[in-house]
Amino acid sequence: MSATVDNTEANASPPKEFTLRSTIALIGAFMALFCTLGFQNAFGVFQAFYHATILRDHSEFDIAWIGSLLTFMIFFFAAPAGVLVDRVGPTHSLTRHLQPLLTFGAIATILATFMISLCKELYQFLLAQGILLGIGNAFLLCPAMATVTRLFDHHRGAANGIMIAGSSIGGIIWPIMLDQLLNKDGVSFGWTFRIVGFVVLPLCLFMVATIRPAPKTPHDSDREGIELSHGESESDHKAQGAEGPAAIIKNPTFLILCAGLSVATFGLFSPLFFISTYATDQGLSVSLAFYLVSMLNGASMVGRVSTGFLADRYGNFNLCFLTIASSGLIAMCWTKATNTVGIIFFALAYGYTSGVSPSDLKKNPPGPNTAVAGHVQSPNPVCRPALDARVEGGCRRHSLCRASNSVSIVLFSRIARSCRLTHSYSGLVGTPISGRLLKHGYLALSMYSGAALLAGAGLVLIARLRQNTKLMAKV
């Protein structure tokens, strides 16, 4: 019987993945990250603009809560959004063309964008740009990323790379667009955000129309039948599949890794949020300060690609530790950049190291904290593959469990939700702490950011040594 199964699996040719339908869905997912994480990555522009104009009576600490709340809501609501994706599917239809999860996310995102254009007070920005936009973004991201994961298997690395690029490209384009509108064309803040809303509106309509799961094929049915033909009940397979996630949640190495990445998140966003205000304080023009955010995000995209190849050669844990530690050291050198060339170099260097993400996602599938992929939602994805085998051991025999393991790439497993929640709290309080420290100068801010990253790197190093104590080993 086993020989028959093996022959059947060997002879079964995988279906073509880059079809017209799947390619259009991939473009829709790219747009989802462009409009959500790409826009979030541009918050440094708003930090500087709000402090200089609309919210000039408020401190950097107060204004930083807007971006921190946005980050928190995206991470926090990834958990319930993930549960709904697990239960009803990423684009489950009440009617043929109604896709409630994506539709809710699109409506909330568009509504928040237009509501921001009416904001005058800090609490209004917190409600619109912090809470409502964050919730909408979470419900756009999760279905989009889940759909790509389910559409692509053999070419998942390329598909995820294209999708994730949307966040970096958004982080480059949005600051340039905002600078052109606010600083050069003299468009009012209200109309600037209305223009942003009119840009996001057709993109959201495109997402809702195109992000659809692949129809079930005979290949899928045959494979599921093969996997359930060993004489064991489906409940037995589910019980075996549950052992993997339960085991890794109790794994000390995984817990130390999550702790390290959460600690690093406290300082991770500080340069991204405050580099524009730092540049203007050093005498750089407002336009160049806006462009620094684009430069930082552009460098993060380069780092995301190149470090993926290095991770394949030298090991995932090793690169994870080195990039977090490098980010911490660069952050501590922040205030040594006092002229135009130095500040640009700092933005490029920090963007490169903090934007690390695996490029070969097929060989090294991302783990619980892929972020949501945008800029620096933490370098942890490269560390997950070393732990994946422990999960897959209990899951590979059942298609439903194996699908659940794939969906963990976009935060929908119990492992992913628990680790993402810890990141949400770190992201919530980390940047406001940076804003509070600004009254003591940017040196205090840079030391805080660097210390948090180095402390997180230390915990990641402990997790790495638990995997293999040999310093030169590929882990």
UniProtKB/Swiss-Prot annotation:
The keyword Transmembrane helix applies. GO terms for molecular function: transmembrane transporter activity. It comes from the Eukaryota. It is a multi-pass membrane protein. Residues 217-240 have a biased composition (Basic and acidic residues). GO terms for cellular component: plasma membrane. The chain crosses the membrane at residues 26-46, 65-85, 98-118, 125-145, 158-178, 189-209, 255-275, 283-303, 329-349, 443-463. It holds the Pfam family MFS_1. The keyword Transmembrane applies. Belongs to the major facilitator superfamily. Monocarboxylate porter (TC 2.A.1.13) family. This is Leporins efflux protein lepC. It comes from Aspergillus flavus (strain ATCC 200026 / FGSC A1120 / IAM 13836 / NRRL 3357 / JCM 12722 / SRRC 167).
